[in-house]
């Protein structure tokens, strides 16, 4: 009917677009993780971390600090359970633990990303090799004619 005519006309003019193709599940999962990846990138830039060694060097003192504060807090829980210092320690521990978690995630996910990049490069090289082979066979076919 008329509605279909309008859809067809607007589509041909480029006003209406086709449905976007389905995104692969792997890519969809990566998109979901995008906010976390951005947060990790900002963390790396903020602390000027460029290698895993620097990441470990940043994380180690944090873990030692958390351990010392936890030990102090445990001692305070026994001696004065309602002390103000316990709340102060908890406020200091929260961002330290968050930074440690981010460091651990960066370390794990950077390895995963390296592996994905390696696989993508392999697939790209294989595709280029296949293209070269088909191009050579086409050239041979045209030369033999």
Indicate residue ranges for each PLM-predicted region:
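Extended intrinsically disordered terminal tails
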Residues: 1-145
